[in-house]
Amino acid sequence: MAVKRAPSKKVRAEQARRPKKNPLIAAGIETVDYKDVNLLRTFISDRGKIRSRRVTGLTPQQQRQVAVAVKNAREMALLPFTSR
């Protein structure tokens, strides 16, 4: 009688490596603006840190735009530096 086995580690690893959906492309946004605070909050952790590309699924260019926009929004007091 054949025993059903769980998928091998290699198969599970391939399934786990699916790229994340790019939230900026999904929303149709080409450039990130520091005044769009609701959008920027999606890229900030609950501790106030900018989330990494691996977490957000952004391209390198978009990640740089988001980082600059978040820093500008912090300087303009639209976003807090920390979240207490």
From Swiss-Prot:
Any single GO CC term annotated in Swiss-Prot or TrEMBL for this entry: cytosolic small ribosomal subunit
Any Pfam family: Ribosomal_S18
Biased composition (Basic residues): 1-10
Domain of life: Bacteria
Region (Disordered): 1-20
Keywords per UniProt: Ribonucleoprotein, Ribosomal protein, RNA-binding, rRNA-binding
InterPro entries: Ribosomal_bS18, Ribosomal_bS18_CS, Ribosomal_bS18_sf
UniProt GO MF annotations: small ribosomal subunit rRNA binding; structural constituent of ribosome
Any single biological process term in GO: translation
Family affiliation: Belongs to the bacterial ribosomal protein bS18 family.
Subunit structure: Part of the 30S ribosomal subunit. Forms a tight heterodimer with protein bS6.
Function of the protein: Binds as a heterodimer with protein bS6 to the central domain of the 16S rRNA, where it helps stabilize the platform of the 30S subunit.
Protein name: Small ribosomal subunit protein bS18B
Species for this entry: Nocardia farcinica (strain IFM 10152)
Lineage: Bacteria, Bacillati, Actinomycetota, Actinomycetes, Mycobacteriales
